[in-house]
Amino acid sequence: MATADNLDTPIAKKIDLSKGKLPFKGKGLSGCVDINSKSIEEQRRYGVERLAAAYRIFSGHGFDLGLVGHISFRDPEFKDCFWINPLGYHFSQMKVSDLCLMNQNGELVYGKERTGDSAQSIHSNIYKSRPDINAVAHAHPMYGKTFSTLNKELKPITQDSCAFYKRTATFTDYDGVANGPVSYTHLRAHETRPY
């Protein structure tokens, strides 16, 4: 498995995650200072720190069942690459140093280990089709999976559910795990939904 120390790619040579450290107030995500990043290094560091925090937040809400699920962030400099969790790392333990940078062809560009094929397929296809999107989250939470078996849209019966009314997609033609470009048909519903 390729590691950050032996990856000899032009992109890996340009990335230094020790640069661009951002100021913090207090502790935890609520203490983060939202700044207008001026340098690419600051933008990258800002994104990967929040990505690592997002994994821990998902874990705190129980969205980390087994090895399924992933969250990614499009690199601010290399737009055909995205930061994501490597396969087998638990959300609750995720650190910036654990994240890997993958290109849309499934190649590890920076990091210790690559992500799984399913994550690669889902995230790269969304980023290819939606250049306006800079982050993608995919999870299998208990209640989400349970509700999905009903194959129904969420109804606006509470204030919280109103945020998702007519903004969710259901997939009725499931034909297996999303491991390649053929599975892109599962993701097409996202192209027409107004987010």
Predicted regions and their residues:
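Extreme N-terminal flexible tails
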Residues: 2-38
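Glycine-rich, charged/polar anion/phosphate-binding loops
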Residues: 123, 183-184
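Short histidine-centered catalytic/ligand-binding loop motif
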Residues: 40, 111-115, 169-177
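Class I SAM-dependent methyltransferase SAM-binding "motif I" and its flanking Rossmann-like core
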Residues: 142-183
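An anion-binding catalytic pocket shared by soluble metabolic enzymes
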Residues: 41, 48-135, 144-157
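Short alpha-helix carrying the canonical HExxH Zn2+-binding catalytic motif
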Residues: 139
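Conserved small/polar residues in nucleotide/adenosyl-binding loops
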Residues: 185-192
